[in-house]
């Protein structure tokens, strides 16, 4: 997939609709009967990485769901995600090695927004420790195509092109990018993975800030994590109406 040029952030209307994240959290309870039918896991460790300006509290519902699906779900334990730095990347690497040693198994990485960019970098650096990567609304094709970057005056900084090119590179482990066309924070096109035998994109109808507790996104995560280690197949579809998830073919 060729690099995108001058991706625009989402419209101000979509940004205003981000408030629906609270409704998506409230909708999680009535969706539990649907989620009860998702596959259970094999107990392998999963490291969940929060988004920008968020911490482990924001991923509590996601981790609780994963534990109910029989995974060892772990927080990142690095406080608020204040943006990339060599220190954070180094400490995340230590956290990954710790979990690998503790469980004696490779670790699946689930990253929300900026957390997904961290997950991709970890998998690039230590593929031997990573089982698979799942990103939620993570703009790895162009991190600057976001309303946050625009408001902070960080759009098209020097070196941003080199960073985006590195982030776009396909990973050596199975990769699923979950995205929403109605995302109000980042351009959904900036979340598109280059499709391949072990790479895919899955679309849900969710806000950016609510994706980590959106029923359809949780169902996709459960489906992806439940695949036996060493095997992988593309996602097809799940759910109905607002809880619909389906694979997006980019070829």
Where are these regions (language model features)?
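Short amphipathic alpha-helical segments, especially helix-boundary/capping motifs
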Residues: 25-26, 36-40, 67-73, 92-96, ...
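Helical cap/lid subdomain of alpha/beta-hydrolase-fold lipid enzymes
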Residues: 4, 124-251
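Phosphate-binding glycine-rich loops and adjacent basic patches that engage nucleotide phosphates
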Residues: 20-29, 50-59, 176-188
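Flexible, membrane-associating and regulatory peripheral segments of lipid-active enzymes
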Residues: 1-46, 59-64, 69, 102, ...
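A near-ubiquitous, low-amplitude feature marking generic local secondary-structure context
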Residues: 2-18, 32, 45, 49, ...
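Serine-dependent carboxylesterase/thioesterase catalytic core
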Residues: 44-57, 61, 65-173, 178, ...
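Generic surface-pattern signal
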Residues: 28-31, 97, 101, 154, ...
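Residue-level detector of functional hotspots within protein domains
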Residues: 11, 32, 38, 57, ...
């Amino acid at each position: 997939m060729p690099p995108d040029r001058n991706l625009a952030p989402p419209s101000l209307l979509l940004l205003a609709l981000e408030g629906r994240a609270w409704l998506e959290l409230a909708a999680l309870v009535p969706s539990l009967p649907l989620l009860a039918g998702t596959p259970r896991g094999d107990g392998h460790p999963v490291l969940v990485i929060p988004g920008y300006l968020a911490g482990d509290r924001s991923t509590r519902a996601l981790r609780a769901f994963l534990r109910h699906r029989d995974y060892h779900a772990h927080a990142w334990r690095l406080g608020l995600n204040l943006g990339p730095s060599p220190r954070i990347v180094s400490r995340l690497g230590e956290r990954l090695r710790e979990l690998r040693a503790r469980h004696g198994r490779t670790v699946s990485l689930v990253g929300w927004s900026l957390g997904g960019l961290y997950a991709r970098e970890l998998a690039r650096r230590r593929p031997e420790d990573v089982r698979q990567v799942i990103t939620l609304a993570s703009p790895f094709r162009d991190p600057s195509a976001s309303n946050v970057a625009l408001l902070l005056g960080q759009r098209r900084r020097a070196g941003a092109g080199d960073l985006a090119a590195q982030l776009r590179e396909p990973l050596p482990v199975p990769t699923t990018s979950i995205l929403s066309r109605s995302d109000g924070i980042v351009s959904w096109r900036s979340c598109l993975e280059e499709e391949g035998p072990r790479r895919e994109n899955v679309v849900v109808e969710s806000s950016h800030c609510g994706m980590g507790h959106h029923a359809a996104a949780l169902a996709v995560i459960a489906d992806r994590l439940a695949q036996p280690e060493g095997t992988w197949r593309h996602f097809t579809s799940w759910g109905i109406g607002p809880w619909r998830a389906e694979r997006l073919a980019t070829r």
